[in-house]
Amino acid sequence: MDNERQKALDTVIKNMEKSFGKGAVMKLGDNKGRRVSSTSSGSVTVDNALGVGGYPKGRIIEIYGPESSGKTTVALHAIAEVQKNGGVAAFIDAEHALDPVYAQALGVDIDNLYLSQPDHGEQGLEIAEAFVRSGAVDIVVVDSVAALTPKAEIEGEMGDTHVGLQARLMSQALRKLSGAISKSNTTAIFINQIREKVGVMFGNPETTPGGRALKFYSSVRLEVRRAEQLKQGQDIVGNRTKIKVVKNKVAPPFRVAEVDIMYGQGISKEGELIDLGVENDIVDKSGAWYSYNGDRMGQGKENVKNYLKENPQIKEEIDRKLREKLGIFDGDVDENENEDDSPKTLFDE
């Protein structure tokens, strides 16, 4: 570029920075050293499927699936992990159905979890926005999008038609939230339900409520589905759950994580260590027997789970080896380890 054009460009950039602040315009290469920072999902299997060691910070995540598939459980594990690393979490309970006893069993510090049970959708999203803009909250979970009922619908009569109200509400909210989420480095998780499209003869009839906006603004979309029931004798004690990454802007999509969600306990950490350990040649499996470093741990997966619960040192050793092999870090992964812990944006110098 010749000198005259460069001078003109420099003048324009100076004027922009004077009007909008330093860093309003930058060269992309100035931040080429930065990588996506993440916070652990609380499951090494899900962290591996996400490709960046967890949920990306400063991004919108959608977790959707059928009823009782484990969506809230997956989100609560993420909250527990953030709190374990000294972070602050907020939960917008639009469904008014959060069980504090179950949340505590999953490792959530309920005494330090900020909870809101809004009266209508606008209130819930405004509270979420306030948490995000504060810059002091590390993770915000909205449960669920389908329960964010517009105020006009709540105040109206039963049977009144309100076409597209919720979709417009979500579209407006996400337009306001997306920039604030990025600048505050907050992880925003929206839980969503599934609906059936009427009259679909071919293709997938399933869709998610709230319009298309959330699909577009989400950097990661996870589909959670029950694969099979887990039994001990005649008793059903949990579900084998498939978590598919159907959209991923920060790593390759379409990876699948399979985890055991046990009733009253959440994701079985021991179960995923066994599965991933066998897959990555850290745990040896011969028939129904499982071994580690030549020592037998037990026959059958349930017995090995109990063995790992009783031997936490071996459990931690397998976990450490797995994370090293898969390149996953335990806890928060920061863009720059030498930087302070204050919220960062691309515009920070």
From Swiss-Prot:
Q: Give the residues the record marks as binding ATP.
A: G65, P66, E67, S68, S69, G70, K71, T72
The answer to whether the entry has keyword NADP is no
Q: What does the UniProt entry say about where the protein is found?
A: Cytoplasm
> Which CDD domains does UniProt cross-reference here?
RecA
Give the primary localization class: cytoplasm
Which controlled-vocabulary keywords does the entry list?
ATP-binding, Cytoplasm, DNA damage, DNA recombination, DNA repair, DNA-binding, Nucleotide-binding, SOS response
State the superkingdom: Bacteria
Q: One MF term in GO for this entry?
A: damaged DNA binding
Q: Which Pfam families match?
A: RecA (PF00154), RecA_C (PF21096)
Q: One of this protein's GO BP terms?
A: DNA repair
The Gene Ontology CC terms held by the record are: cytosol
Question: Which residue positions does the secretion signal occupy?
Answer: none
Entry annotated with the keyword Hydrolase:
no
Question: SMART domains from the entry?
Answer: AAA
Q: Which spans does this entry mark as compositional bias, Acidic residues?
A: 331-340
Instruction: Spell out the residue ranges making up region: Disordered.
Output: 329-349
InterPro entries xref list: AAA+_ATPase, DNA_recomb/repair_RecA, DNA_recomb/repair_RecA_CS, P-loop_NTPase, RecA-like_C, RecA-like_N, RecA_ATP-bd, RecA_C_sf
Q: What PANTHER family is this protein classified in?
A: MITOCHONDRIAL DNA REPAIR PROTEIN RECA HOMOLOG-RELATED, RECA
Family from the record: Belongs to the RecA family.
Free-text function comment from the UniProt entry:
Can catalyze the hydrolysis of ATP in the presence of single-stranded DNA, the ATP-dependent uptake of single-stranded DNA by duplex DNA, and the ATP-dependent hybridization of homologous single-stranded DNAs. It interacts with LexA causing its activation and leading to its autocatalytic cleavage.
Under what name is this protein listed?
Protein RecA
In its UniProt entry, the species of origin is given as Staphylococcus epidermidis (strain ATCC 35984 / DSM 28319 / BCRC 17069 / CCUG 31568 / BM 3577 / RP62A)
Instruction: Name the lineage.
Output: Bacteria, Bacillati, Bacillota, Bacilli, Bacillales
What's the name of its gene?
A: recA
